[in-house]
């Protein structure tokens, strides 16, 4: 008795341990979602699955039970009354298993479609073929098709159950009789028609009906057809395929009646005829469609397909939100004068002379401070700095987890990044280096931007956990040879209670979490620290932009992300990159210190986000609740902009005939590799190759020109604004035919503006401009000399900006010594307008040489506290002292003497501050 009780207790304990191990992931998810404030989002899925599972299980169980009940007489006849009761138990158990598995599979795969179906929001647009609202295709049709597939699967399961029962019981009965030498029952005399003829007749009829209905549903998929010259249903789809589908559906209905009657009457010929008729129709459809397409449509394709091409143009433009682009004609002239530049000097003052690649390389050499920091990316933003609207590069300084070798350093000691580097986009120092306004550790801030808490616990680095508030403290930042520590005082993370220590030891499969003496009950474990994975964990149904960016807000750092709603179910819209409808409907803000995540709805007209609002109550906030200063940092997402640019290469036209003849197809402008040293390393002008020809020969050197964030002013506008620009060429040619700009400041956010250029003229595109640079004898000679001396020549971004009715071209050249710790420095500026092109040391000299324009002296006198586009404007003695300190700091950095480096940098900061106040 005691042994029995002991065994029961041991088994119970073992079961509890197993359940605990299995449920660790669920328990942690519940705690984490509660911490971030979205526990209701986590349970939305679970509750939906549970709500669906119960009725679906009942449906499955009842259908199978009723079906088995109809077979009871046949089963009793096959096994006898004695064994029938025991067989019933197996049937009940089998029904339970099948129903649980079927309901579970259906609920876990269809819960989302059902929620979309029940919370559908109309688009207010209908497709041109069936006159159905777009919401039918996006929210409803996928569920209906899935349910029909499930119903067909259930019919097939019932047929399989019938066959398995018939074979299993009949075969078992035959073996049993032979083994015991009892009278042998010849199972062949009890055929399957007698066993389940009526049941199979019903199933076959229902299956035929379902197949017929599925063909009616299949008709709706024709709006995604790729058969014709445009995406969506074409002439053949509408006039041939759709009719065939209807005929097949009618044939299936007739067949269901024929099959039912024929099975009962044991007449197989009608069954064969009906099934053969359907098969012939199914086979005949593509044959007739191909014949029609080749011999009817092809000879008259333009006339027959014209309305369907129009449908595709309209749908694609609406779906990608490019149907309301403001298009302006522009015929660029070459008459930029000094007067015109003076009228547009705000454009000149904001010309982008820094490029992300060289700048990030410089940051990594000078601003990492220690090897356990890293800069993952440099983003472009704008701030009001000391009263002036200024575009800047911003790069957060995060912890480099790969530099950590021990568990304690990786998870307890080095827990957060510190501060950021910020420099002006439109200026460099006299050495061609970034003009910093925020730098170093602790942060040296020469702006009026308030940054009190520069710590980064959540960022773009890896997603591994850290444990804060430990006994040893966390490394904060270095000061010479000493290390300052910090104890986390934020709200992020889960408390390390004894229960949680056990839980996370199991979850992370690391006993150190349980055994470490540094971890106390006040310690917190911070999970999902990668901001992209963090927001994906909360809202996986959104698509996120690949480039989050950091913003200084209210004395701390926050991340801003663009999130998209998308689908591939928009009728007649041609898919690009897996979607054929997309909206940037959500802005996500993640606190870099606490990890708080807020989702703000920015497009209230998007039906998909309105559907999500109904499904996930409490997840999204209205835009009115976002702090106003954060709205000033909205960026038009580059991923979306480039996707729209790709779509516009084909769908910038409204005329279906132009799309059909492909007479006006575009390409996004090409750029070449920005490293020019390889091309010119021989230092021989005679051996230099045209970049255009070289790009044609080596496709690896070509790449689509990325959209650039620029601070500029559009023609007819009064103020400069940050914009995203992209350039287009005529397909197969390199002459530029259009410029696309996305506006993002204030009420203009989201507006797209396109300037079209006359196609009969040669307007220099980025690659043609780069080719001109290489072909100019003065420029190529200077570049060849640098390359011949062993320096690496790096080309910056090509900038093309409109100035009233003209185009100004800008390219910068960086030099980088061929040594391990060398840094790229901007050494030359190339400016061009029309056929004129010059290369000079800075913007001022280039403007003076090209246009005889010199207004920077006035700017220098009136803005002594600021750095000009390329030079520090202070007395020579101060500049010399600053240069000497900077060079000494760099030398100390190269030698790994970080204490000395810090001293020189601090002294340099004092000198610069003194210069700025003189």
From Swiss-Prot:
The record describes its membrane topology as: Multi-pass membrane protein
TM spans, by residue? 8-28, 46-66, 91-111, 151-171, 200-220, 243-263, 271-291
Q: Does the keyword Transferase apply?
A: no
Where is this protein found? Cell membrane
> What domain of life does the native source organism fall in?
Bacteria
Going by the UniProt record, its keywords in alphabetical order are: Cell membrane, Membrane, Transmembrane, Transmembrane helix
Q: Which InterPro entries match?
A: UPF0182
Is Cytoplasm given among the entry's keywords?
no
Gene Ontology cellular component annotations, sorted alphabetically: extracellular region; plasma membrane
The record's annotation in Pfam families points to: UPF0182
The record's family statement is: Belongs to the UPF0182 family.
Q: What is this protein called?
A: UPF0182 protein CPR_0011
């Amino acid at each position: 008795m005691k042994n029995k009780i002991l065994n029961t207790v041991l088994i119970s304990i073992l079961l509890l341990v197993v359940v605990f191990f299995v449920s660790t992931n669920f328990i942690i998810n519940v705690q984490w979602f509660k911490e971030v404030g979205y526990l209701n989002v986590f349970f939305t899925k679970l509750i939906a699955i549970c709500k669906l599972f119960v009725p679906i299980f009942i449906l499955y169980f009842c259908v199978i039970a009723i079906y088995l009940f109809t077979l009871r007489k046949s089963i009793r006849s096959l096994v006898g009354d004695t064994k029938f009761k025991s067989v019933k138990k197996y049937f009940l158990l089998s029904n339970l298993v099948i129903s649980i598995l079927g309901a579970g599979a259906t609920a876990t795969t269809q819960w989302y479609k059902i929620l979309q179906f029940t919370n559908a929001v109309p688009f207010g647009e209908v497709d041109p073929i069936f006159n159905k609202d777009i919401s039918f295709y996006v929210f409803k049709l996928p569920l209906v098709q899935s349910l029909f597939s499930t119903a067909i699967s259930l019919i097939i399961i019932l047929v399989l159950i019938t066959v398995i029962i018939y074979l299993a019981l009949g075969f078992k009965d035959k073996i049993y009789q032979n083994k015991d030498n009892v009278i042998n029952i010849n199972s062949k005399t009890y055929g399957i028609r007698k066993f389940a003829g009526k049941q199979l007749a019903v199933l076959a009829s229902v299956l035929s009906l379902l197949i017929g209905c599925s063909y009616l549903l299949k008709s709706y998929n024709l709006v995604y057809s790729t058969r014709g010259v445009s995406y969506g249903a074409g002439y053949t789809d509408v006039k041939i395929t759709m009719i065939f589908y209807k005929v097949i559906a009618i044939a299936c209905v007739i067949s269901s009646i024929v099959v039912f009657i024929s099975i009962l009457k044991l007449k197989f010929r009608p069954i064969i005829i009906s099934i053969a008729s359907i098969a012939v129709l199914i086979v005949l459809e593509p044959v007739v469609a191909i014949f029609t397409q080749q011999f009817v449509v092809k000879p008259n394709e333009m006339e027959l397909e014209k309305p369907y091409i129009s449908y595709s143009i309209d749908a694609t433009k609406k779906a990608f939100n490019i149907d309301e682009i403001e298009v302006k004609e522009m015929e660029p002239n070459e008459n930029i004068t000094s007067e015109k530049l003076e009228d547009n000097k705000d454009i000149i003052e904001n010309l982008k002379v820094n490029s992300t690649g060289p700048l990030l390389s410089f940051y990594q050499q000078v601003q990492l401070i220690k090897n356990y920091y890293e800069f993952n990316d440099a983003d472009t933003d704008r701030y009001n700095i000391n009263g002036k609207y200024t575009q800047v590069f911003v790069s957060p300084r995060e912890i480099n987890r790969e530099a950590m070798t021990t568990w304690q350093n990786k998870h307890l000691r080095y827990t957060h990044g510190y501060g950021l580097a910020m420099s002006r986009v439109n200026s460099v120092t006299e050495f061609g280096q970034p003009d910093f306004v925020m730098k170093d550790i602790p942060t040296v801030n020469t702006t009026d931007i308030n940054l009190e808490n520069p710590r980064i616990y959540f960022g773009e680095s890896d997603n591994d956990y850290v444990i804060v508030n430990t006994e040893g403290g966390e490394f904060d930042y270095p000061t010479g040879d000493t290390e300052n520590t910090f104890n986390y005082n934020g709200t992020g993370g889960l408390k390390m209670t004894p229960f949680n220590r056990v839980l996370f030891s199991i979850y992370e499969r690391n006993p150190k979490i349980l055994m470490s003496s540094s971890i106390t009950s006040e310690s917190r474990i911070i999970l999902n620290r990668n901001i992209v994975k963090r927001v994906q964990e909360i809202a996986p149904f959104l698509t996120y932009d690949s480039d989050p960016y950091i913003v200084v807000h209210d004395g701390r750092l926050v991340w801003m992300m663009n999130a998209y709603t998308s689908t591939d179910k928009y009728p007649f819209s041609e898919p690009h990159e897996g979607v054929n409808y997309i909206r940037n409907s959500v802005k996500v803000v993640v606190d870099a210190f606490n990890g708080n995540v807020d989702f703000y709805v920015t497009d209230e007209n998007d039906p998909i986000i309105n559907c999500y609002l109904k499904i996930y109550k409490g997840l999204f906030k209205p835009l009115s609740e976002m702090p106003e200063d954060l709205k000033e940092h909205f960026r038009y997402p580059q991923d979306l902009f480039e996707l729209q640019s790709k779509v516009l290469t084909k769908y910038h036209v409204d005329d279906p005939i132009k799309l059909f003849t492909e007479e006006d197809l575009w390409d996004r402008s090409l750029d070449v590799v920005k490293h020019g040293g390889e091309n010119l390393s021989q230092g021989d002008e005679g051996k230099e190759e045209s970049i255009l020809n070289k790009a044609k020969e080596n496709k690896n050197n070509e790449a689509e020109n990325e959209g650039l964030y620029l601070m500029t002013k559009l023609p007819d506008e009064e103020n400069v604004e940050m914009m995203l620009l992209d350039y287009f060429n005529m397909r197969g040619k390199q002459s530029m035919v259009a410029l696309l700009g996305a506006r993002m400041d204030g009420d203009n956010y989201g507006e797209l503006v396109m300037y079209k250029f006359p196609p009969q003229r040669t307007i220099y595109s980025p690659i043609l401009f780069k080719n001109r640079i290489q072909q100019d004898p003065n420029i190529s000679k200077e570049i060849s000399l640098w390359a011949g001396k062993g320096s690496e020549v790096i080309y910056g971004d090509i900038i093309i900006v409109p100035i009233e009715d003209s185009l100004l071209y800008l390219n910068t050249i960086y030099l980088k010594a061929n040594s391990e710790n060398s840094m790229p420095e901007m050494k030359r500026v190339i400016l061009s307008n029309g056929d004129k092109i010059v290369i000079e040391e800075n913007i001022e000299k280039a403007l003076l040489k090209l246009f005889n324009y010199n207004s920077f002296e006035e700017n220098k006198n009136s803005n002594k506290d600021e750095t000009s586009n390329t030079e520090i404007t202070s007395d020579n003695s101060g500049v010399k002292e600053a240069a000497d300190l900077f060079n000494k700091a760099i030398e100390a950095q190269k030698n790994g003497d970080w204490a000395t480096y810090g001293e020189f940098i601090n002294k340099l900061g004092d000198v610069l501050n003194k210069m700025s106040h003189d």
